[in-house]
Structure formats: structure tokens, C-alpha cells
């Protein structure tokens, strides 16, 4: 359901994003009984997220949503634990029918923008049904070519017009400000991703606000972490947070000390980039032997020419750096 499945061992940055989500759940568990939550997500054929959620968070009530029958058959064959209910159902139909009467952790991992307006409608629908302290994580593609592929030789003005029309077609007036002003400079390779992050974040906020607007309990959605990362052809934006009233949020924020969490996003604009370098075992061992001493680490990193962004990113995320080994089974 989440698109073409690519294993985590080929997507180091996505693996780190997942580790940040797990840390966030651990942070919330200081006041919330996370183990009693129902986990809802897109398992894929290997159900790797579900295996991790059970092993690391001790969740024992989990629901996997899948539309493709062939993948659903593989899920049932690869089922790691019998506490996972693999359903052959679309996310829309599930959200429509499910009561959300029990505390929930929902991860909607979207890999394609082709149905993004429908996906946002599902988020709006979900927001009408959740309760305080329910947790929602969403992943959106932000690879510009996924929204419009610039043609060879296409002028910048023509590209801008076609790109804007594609955004209007995909998001519609419901989720896109049709008066949005886009400059030619916004379409440079360096800036266009930031533009898309802003557009998709605003669309997500709009879906949430529409869903919550008619409620009597006046809960809001509070982001904990916003991340962007690239793994090969995939450029993704992830938003993780929870629903609560303002007093509930303030109490939980103080109890869990959000502001001192290394990966806490202080605002909707605080999108943190995960871009770890690919290291040899020798390089990693050498760097790790100097950590967490930043001065010694910087000197070691300069020995094999890591650029400043790579050095800073590894220093920030080294605890979460995945370590994959080949084994004989």
C-alpha cells in the first residue's frame, strides 16, 4: 500500500527516521501507557515495522493495512507474531469503519503523490475520529520529479507553469493556495525541495484542521518531529506528533521535557534533515572511538574528507546509525 517496497537495509536514512520515531514513543511513555496502544500501519510484505514495534515498544495489538492481494498473501506467510492482524483493505475503508475507541498509533507511509488529495482526505477523516493522546505519523514524497518531471530543453518559465498546474491538479483548491506565488529562483535544485516541504506541510495542516474543526473537545495536533531524508530515488518528508488539548499538551511537554529532546522540532518550519554519510567499517570505528568528544571527532572526520554537512549529520545521528551484517541462516 505504501508503494514499491524497498528494504530498510538499503535505506539508512529511513532507518534513522524510524529510530527517531521509536525514541519519540519512548519519550511519551513517561506519561502515556504506550504498550496499551493499537498500532496501525502499512506492513509491506516483510512486516518489518511491526516486528520492530513489538520488539522495542512491546505493542501487542497491531493492524496492517494492504490493498494488493499478492502482498497480503506474503504478509500472512511472513507473519512474525500472531498479534498482527493483516487486513486486505484500503486505508480509506479502514479509517471509515474503524472506531478508534482504543488509544492508537497510526503511521500512514505514503510513497507516491498520485493519490495525495485522497490521502489528505483520509487524514482529515481520521482527525474526526481520534482522541486525545492518539499518535499520528505520516510520510509524504517530496521528490520534485514525482510531482512534475521537467522535460529536456523545457524553459524555466514553461517548467514553472507546468509544475504549478501539476500541483493544482494533485492537491486541488482544498489543500493548495491557488494564489501561491512561486518565483523562478524557488525552482532551483537547492530550493525546490524546500518549496515542496512548505506546500505539503501546509496541506497536511489543512487536512488536520478541517478534521478537527467541528469537534467539541477542541483538541489540536502537535508535531514532535519533522524530518526530511533521501535514500536513492526517494526523497521523503515525515511528520510525527499527537492529538491533545492545549492544557494536555503543556502538561505532557513539561513532564516529558520535549524541549531537551535532541530531535524535537520546535515549530512546523523546523524540519530536520537526515543525511548520514555512507561509511566503511574502518571509518565508522575510527569516528565512534572519538565520540562524543566533538573536537576529537571533527579532527578524525577531516582525515578522510567528510564534508561539513556529512560531519554534522553523523555527529547528530551516530547513535541511530544502522549496522547491517551478512549472516548465514
Stretches with model-predicted labels:
Residues 2-8, 96, 100-103, 113-329:
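Class I S-adenosyl-L-methionine
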Residues 38, 104-105:
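Structural motif
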Residues 41, 64, 107, 135-140:
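A structural signal for short, well-ordered beta-strand segments and their strand-loop junctions
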Amino acid at each position: 500500500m505504501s508503494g514499491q517496497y524497498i528494504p530498510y537495509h538499503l535505506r539508512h536514512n529511513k532507518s534513522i527516521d524510524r529510530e527517531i520515531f521509536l525514541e519519540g514513543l519512548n519519550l511519551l511513555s513517561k506519561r502515556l501507557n504506550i504498550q496499551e496502544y493499537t498500532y496501525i500501519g502499512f506492513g509491506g510484505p516483510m512486516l518489518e515495522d511491526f516486528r520492530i514495534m513489538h520488539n522495542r515498544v512491546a505493542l501487542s495489538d497491531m493492524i496492517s493495512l494492504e490493498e494488493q492481494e499478492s502482498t497480503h498473501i506474503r504478509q500472512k506467510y511472513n507473519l512474525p507474531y500472531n498479534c498482527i492482524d493483516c487486513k486486505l483493505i484500503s486505508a480509506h475503508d479502514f479509517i471509515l469503519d474503524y472506531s478508534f475507541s482504543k488509544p492508537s498509533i497510526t503511521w500512514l507511509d505514503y510513497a507516491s503523490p498520485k493519490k495525495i488529495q485522497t490521502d489528505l482526505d483520509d487524514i482529515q477523516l481520521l482527525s474526526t475520529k481520534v482522541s486525545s493522546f492518539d499518535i499520528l505519523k505520516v510520510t509524504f514524497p517530496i521528490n520534485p520529479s514525482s510531482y512534475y518531471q521537467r522535460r529536456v530543453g523545457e524553459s524555466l518559465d514553461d517548467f514553472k507553469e507546468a509544475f504549478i498546474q501539476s500541483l493544482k491538479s494533485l492537491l486541488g483548491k482544498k489543500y493548495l493556495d491557488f494564489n501561491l506565488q512561486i518565483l523562478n529562483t524557488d525552482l532551483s535544485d537547492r530550493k525546490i525541495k524546500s518549496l515542496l516541504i512548505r506546500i505539503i506541510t501546509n496541506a497536511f495542516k489543512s487536512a488536520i484542521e478541517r478534521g478537527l474543526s467541528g469537534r467539541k473537545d477542541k483538541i489540536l495536533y502537535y508535531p514532535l518531529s519533522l524530518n526530511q531524508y533521501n535514500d536513492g530515488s526517494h526523497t521523503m518528508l515525515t511528520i510525527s506528533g499527537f492529538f491533545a488539548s492545549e492544557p494536555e499538551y503543556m502538561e505532557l511537554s513539561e513532564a516529558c521535557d520535549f524541549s531537551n529532546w535532541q530531535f524535537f522540532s520546535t515549530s512546523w518550519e523546523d524540519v530536520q534533515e537526515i543525511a548520514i554519510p555512507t561509511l566503511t567499517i574502518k571509518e565508522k570505528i575510527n569516528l565512534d572511538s572519538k565520540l562524543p568528544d566533538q573536537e576529537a571527532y571533527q579532527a578524525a572526520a577531516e582525515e578522510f574528507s567528510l564534508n561539513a554537512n556529512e560531519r554534522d549529520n553523523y555527529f547528530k545521528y551516530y547513535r541511530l546509525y544502522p549496522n547491517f551484517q551478512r549472516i548465514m541462516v
